[in-house]
Amino acid sequence: MSDVSTQSPKVGFVSLGCPKALVDSEQIITQLRAEGYEISGTYGGADLVVVNTCGFIDEAVQESLDAIGEALAENGKVIVTGCLGAKKDAAGQDIITSVHPKVLAVTGPHALGEVMEAVHTHLPKPHDPFIDLVPPQGIKLTPKHYAYLKISEGCNHRCSFCIIPSMRGDLVSRPVAEVMLEAENLLKAGVKELLVISQDTSAYGVDVKFRTGFWNGRPLKTRMTELVGALGELAAQYGAWVRLHYVYPYPSVDEVMPLMAEGKVLPYLDVPLQHAHPEVLKRMKRPANAEKTLDRIRAWREVCPELTIRSTFIAGFPGETEEEFQTLLDFIAEAELDRVGCFAYSPVEGATANDLPGALPDEVREERRARFMEVAERVSARRLQRKVGKTLRVLVDEVNQDGGIGRSSADAPEIDGLVYIAPPSKPYKRYKAGDFVSVKITGADGHDLWGEV
């Protein structure tokens, strides 16, 4: 990596966890560059290292602790931030400092100010920061053609299996003008896809009572429907996509369906359902009802037949009976969800679900997860097969010797399927990463599509 100035202090950065944590990392790196710090691609080339951690499940905790240990071994000066920074062990002690007492500082998630204060303490900032080196859209860790747009922080739900509210706090919605300005800067920089994220996108603005803000001289409510409409209008000026994630199936989501049917935003919803049996949902403390959800899904598809629905579920939750699990399998088959992920229940330290009776053996949880995925993949394969012979708009993510790899409107990066594109048969059909291309679909399996331009 080339150096802009050999005099500038260098910071190494490790980012772990979900897209929301990735946005936190982008904000920290943007501020570091704004203050004149350089970002080092190696531990050895850095004056100190910042590690943004994940603490949601045991595997993520261990990955974060391992990353901290590696940074300490390779560099020696480490500042830790992120969700694991807010977690305590059974004795009430900070998990990170009890395992790695030599870290310089520890903060929780969404702690830009605290991280920068720690950096300033251990690596004073340059006297003449090069503000002009930082692009208006900030420093991004995603490929340049797509970006995550975080609209709020925290969550008002208290699901029994989750500890995110204890780490990230209650819902705090970003001002609508601030969100729109960030979106505009990203689109001006060439981003082709905005992925709207939060802990609960449907609840955007609840905490400020849907306060009216202003954007480009016109009033705009701090509310999901109005924000999504404005983002769709803005993205249309650049020929870009807007994709919605973490959307709870509240009645207000019905208002977004016409926007999807009209092509203003992608006909795609990431809806975290988790289960379908009412008793399991009750134990999970989830705000959902399977019958109402089925009715809502049918109504959505009537308005927008092209709608793709992705969701995640938990198999083997404490107390889950075979009958309750079968209800979940029946729901998956009936709802015909396009994209589905499933986790075998794993206890999370600090979650109230740990105190529920009826914990299931590991082998039962894993067996149910496998059965669930068999059903889900059959549904997905049927729905994907319907696309064979159609021509889809595809955003190219990568080009290699075998052709291209991209995504359709039904595929979010990292979590959904891919479209494998044959090499162009003629020079005028060439494409590169970040291009939109029309792809005729020639084949499908349970997850991916194949086609040609």
Swiss-Prot record:
Positions of the Radical SAM core domain: 141-382
Cofactor note: Binds 2 [4Fe-4S] clusters. One cluster is coordinated with 3 cysteines and an exchangeable S-adenosyl-L-methionine.
Binding site for [4Fe-4S] cluster 1: 18, 54, 83
UniProt GO molecular function: 4 iron, 4 sulfur cluster binding; aspartic acid methylthiotransferase activity; metal ion binding; protein methylthiotransferase activity
EC id: 2.8.4.4
SUPFAM superfamilies associated with the record: Radical SAM enzymes
Positions with a binding annotation for [4Fe-4S] cluster 2: 155, 159, 162
Biological processes, Gene Ontology terms: tRNA modification
Domain MTTase N-terminal: 9-124
Family annotation (InterPro entries): Elp3/MiaA/NifB-like_rSAM, Methylthiotransferase, Methylthiotransferase_CS, Methylthiotransferase_N, Methylthiotransferase_N_sf, NA-bd_OB-fold, Ribosomal_uS12_MeSTrfase_RimO, rSAM
Subcellular location(s) per record: Cytoplasm
Keywords: 4Fe-4S, Cytoplasm, Iron, Iron-sulfur, Metal-binding, S-adenosyl-L-methionine, Transferase
Ranges of residues in domain TRAM: 385-453
Domain of life according to the entry: Bacteria
Reactions listed under catalytic activity: L-aspartate(89)-[ribosomal protein uS12]-hydrogen + (sulfur carrier)-SH + AH2 + 2 S-adenosyl-L-methionine = 3-methylsulfanyl-L-aspartate(89)-[ribosomal protein uS12]-hydrogen + (sulfur carrier)-H + 5'-deoxyadenosine + L-methionine + A + S-adenosyl-L-homocysteine + 2 H(+)
Record's function text: Catalyzes the methylthiolation of an aspartic acid residue of ribosomal protein uS12.
Family annotation (NCBIfam families): 30S ribosomal protein S12 methylthiotransferase RimO, MiaB/RimO family radical SAM methylthiotransferase
Protein's name in the database: Ribosomal protein uS12 methylthiotransferase RimO
Species of the source: Ralstonia nicotianae (strain ATCC BAA-1114 / GMI1000)
